[in-house]
């Protein structure tokens, strides 16, 4: 089975170390996922929006790494908005165990933030993708 392609959204000004950690984990031979694209430092313009939209459209799902200042990150908010508009599955990852992490502006009330352990990360990648796929109904159960 091919690796799950991920767009990694994070606060570049404050959480570069979290980016590095997830990137390192993705390179493990048995990870089952790859970071195909990530937040960039480019100025946010219409061109930036189009580029990020193309990148998010090309992945299977989005991981939003949440740190202490994620709620005030305009870039993370925009990336999450694009993921929602493109109907890409995503989940929020609690980036710092010992600190209070904030949800990005624009996140939904029912978006859960998951602890970051290897097992939870693996489970969330698989279940987020599985839950986003339409469920198939056997012919015999369909209404005529």
Task: Name each model-derived stretch.
Residues 1-58, 138-144:
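Conserved N-terminal substructure of TIR/SEFIR domains
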Residues 27-31, 82-92:
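Arginine/glycine-rich "motif VI" loop of SF2 helicases in the C-terminal RecA-like domain
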Residues 41, 90-100:
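Short beta-alpha junction loops
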Residues 59-60, 110:
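Short, well-ordered alpha-helix to beta-strand connector turns
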Residues 68-86:
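Conserved TIR/SEFIR loop-to-helix hotspot centered on a Trp-containing motif
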Residues 98-114:
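Glycine-rich, charge-decorated loop segments at or immediately adjacent to ligand/cofactor-binding or catalytic sites
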Residues 113-144:
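C-terminal helix of von Willebrand factor
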């Amino acid at each position: 089975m091919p690796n799950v392609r991920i767009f990694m959204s994070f606060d570049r000004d404050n959480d570069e170390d979290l980016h590095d950690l997830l990137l390192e984990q993705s390179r493990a031979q048995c990870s089952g996922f790859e970071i195909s694209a990530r937040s960039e430092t480019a100025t946010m313009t219409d061109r930036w929006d189009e580029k990020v939209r193309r990148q998010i459209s090309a992945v299977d799902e989005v991981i939003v790494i949440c740190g202490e200042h994620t709620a005030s990150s305009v870039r993370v908010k925009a990336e999450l908005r694009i993921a929602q508009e493109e109907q890409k599955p995503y989940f929020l990852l609690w980036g710092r165990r010992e600190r209070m992490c904030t949800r990005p502006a624009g996140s939904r009330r029912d978006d859960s933030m998951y602890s970051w352990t290897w097992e939870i990360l693996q489970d969330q990648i698989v279940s987020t993708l599985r839950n986003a796929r339409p469920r198939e109904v056997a012919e015999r159960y369909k209404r005529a």
